[in-house]
Amino acid sequence: MYVVSTKQMLNNAQRGGYAVPAFNIHNLETMQVVVETAANLHAPVIIAGTPGTFTHAGTENLLALVSAMAKQYHHPLAIHLDHHTKFDDIAQKVRSGVRSVMIDASHLPFAQNISRVKEVVDFCHRFDVSVEAELGQLGGQEDDVQVNEADALYTNPAQAREFAEATGIDSLAVAIGTAHGMYASAPALDFSRLENIRQWVNLPLVLHGASGLSTKDIQQTIKLGICKINVATELKNAFSQALKNYLTEHPEATDPRDYLQSAKSAMRDVVSKVIADCGCEGRA
């Protein structure tokens, strides 16, 4: 079986001291690049999609594509709901076959966050679906979820344990200074906070907002317990910039099968680098 849960992937990463990259998919070409590159490098990867991505592609279509490509490349893949907020939406996609979910209720007060997440966990675990949740809030925008930088909140280590125990989640997304989108300047990550969270919580930890982070910072977070690295903006930017450059230089181009090759090449470089930074090559 090639379409798998993220739970075993992340538990393996936690034991092995590496991270599994979760790449947000926006079109067929992104999927092709991620899966082909991961298969060539024998690296575990997670195919992630926001609510907007699932609406754009269609849940059944996306599930069928992931399954077909996993079989084609004989490579295990996980498909993951990223930053989903509505119980009914999550339930519908789980019933369709999704086996990994991020319920994002981080905008709610602590007690309400726990209540919302536990409702999703109780439902998802009936279907053997792994659940990620976030404590603290990242600045920036991901799909329809937008948080002003001034309102971003860091994860409280002591609350993290209470949150994990009360909800029964399988992995915890932490806020330590990253943000969604690309960075105008290098962020100051709170490694001490991450180390404290690791001491309080024994779950696989997740880092959102990794686009544009240095190799050094990514690898330091992995040493301190991060087992899943999310990448979205870096792929979109590589695709868009390469495509713009190609069409500017070749205004006569009309065949997408030709002019999308430059965009795929640019994304391939990003995927290869992220896999190397995560230390997961050869781990699939």
UniProtKB/Swiss-Prot annotation:
User: Which cofactors does the annotated protein need, by name?
Assistant: Zn(2+)
SUPFAM superfamilies associated with the record? Aldolase
Q: Which gene encodes it?
A: gatY
Give the induction note.
Constitutively expressed. Up-regulated under low pH conditions.
Listed under subunit, the entry gives: Forms a complex with GatZ.
Q: Where does Zn(2+) bind?
A: H83, H180, H208
So what does this thing catalyse?
D-tagatofuranose 1,6-bisphosphate = D-glyceraldehyde 3-phosphate + dihydroxyacetone phosphate
- What family name appears in the similarity comment? Belongs to the class II fructose-bisphosphate aldolase family. TagBP aldolase GatY subfamily.
The annotation note on the cofactor reads: Binds 1 zinc ion per subunit.
GO terms (molecular function) for this protein are:
tagatose-bisphosphate aldolase activity; zinc ion binding
Which top EC class is named for this enzyme in its record? lyase
Query: For dihydroxyacetone phosphate, which residues are the binding ones?
Result: G181, G209, A210, S211, N230, V231, A232, T233
This protein's name: D-tagatose-1,6-bisphosphate aldolase subunit GatY
Q: Where is the active site?
A: D82
Keyword set for this entry? Answer: Galactitol metabolism, Lyase, Metal-binding, Zinc
GO CC terms, sorted: catalytic complex; cytosol
* Function text: Catalytic subunit of the tagatose-1,6-bisphosphate aldolase GatYZ, which catalyzes the reversible aldol condensation of dihydroxyacetone phosphate (DHAP or glycerone-phosphate) with glyceraldehyde 3-phosphate (G3P) to produce tagatose 1,6-bisphosphate (TBP). Requires GatZ subunit for full activity and stability. Is involved in the catabolism of galactitol. Has a high aldolase activity for TBP and a very low one for fructose 1,6-bisphosphate (FBP).
EC code: 4.1.2.40
List, in alphabetical order, the GO biological process terms annotated in this UniProt record: D-tagatose 6-phosphate catabolic process; galactitol catabolic process
Q: Its annotated pathway?
A: Carbohydrate metabolism; D-tagatose 6-phosphate degradation; D-glyceraldehyde 3-phosphate and glycerone phosphate from D-tagatose 6-phosphate: step 2/2
Q: Which HAMAP family does its entry note?
A: TagBP_aldolase_GatY
